Regions:
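Polar/charged low-complexity regulatory segments
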Residues: 2-203
Length: 203
């Protein structure tokens, strides 16, 4: 039985039950990636649980336009040259003979870019976690929505909340949450759907 993240990456690869030139198992075969430090799961963006069958860790998050530029710069500084015009690419680390690589997928959505990647290089995750990446603000992702009129989370809003906004929000401390330029209505929305944010919104 395939896990949900494998289904997502299969869709990104364009698989339809047949082999693909971009096959994660083949690309990362023999990488030796077997464990991640605890920080890989605590930082932002966080890794999904490592799958020994793939030999790489998987990460998925949403970034704003400005943060996308910082992301490509951070990767270039450790030897990975990203071509933003390509939505799917496998990049080997420049000047490194160990065969470390990144398999990167870029998809425009929610007024930003959904970044999905697999890698056997822990330097990549560390670099991204130190870059302070952030998604677009809720009002930018959903300019047509009145948050005060929203009831339960559903559809695109639920998908955005569970997969992108909430993981980012909980990675912030209270001071960082208060510093975000959230409109009052969206701040209240966050507080309602994530109760621990109530103290942050009370400021």
């Amino acid at each position: 039985m395939r896990t949900w993240w494998r289904v997502i990456f299969d869709k990104l690869l364009g698989k339809k039950g047949v082999s693909s030139p971009l096959d994660m198992e083949s690309i990362f075969k023999g990488s030796g990636a077997t464990a991640l430090q605890a920080q890989a799961y605590r930082g932002y963006p966080a890794s999904l649980p490592l799958d020994a069958g793939i030999g790489a860790y998987l990460v998925r998050f949403l970034v704003s336009e400005g943060c996308m530029e910082r992301l490509t710069l951070a990767l270039s500084q450790i030897g990975y040259l990203v071509l933003p015009e390509l939505d799917t690419q496998v990049i080997e680390r420049s000047g490194d003979h160990s065969g470390k690589k990144v398999m990167l997928f870029l998809h425009p959505s929610f007024a930003g870019t959904i970044v999905s990647f697999a890698s056997d290089d822990l330097d990549v995750l560390e670099a991204l976690q130190q870059t302070r990446l952030a998604p677009p603000l809720p009002a930018d992702s959903f300019p047509w929505i009145d948050p005060e009129a929203l009831g339960s989370l559903q559809g695109d809003v639920e998908y955005w909340w569970m997969n992108f906004w909430l993981p980012f929000w909980v990675s912030l401390n209270q001071e960082e949450q208060l510093a975000l330029d959230l409109e009052p209505e969206w701040r209240e929305f966050v507080a309602i759907h994530h109760p621990s944010a109530l103290s942050s919104s009370a400021g």
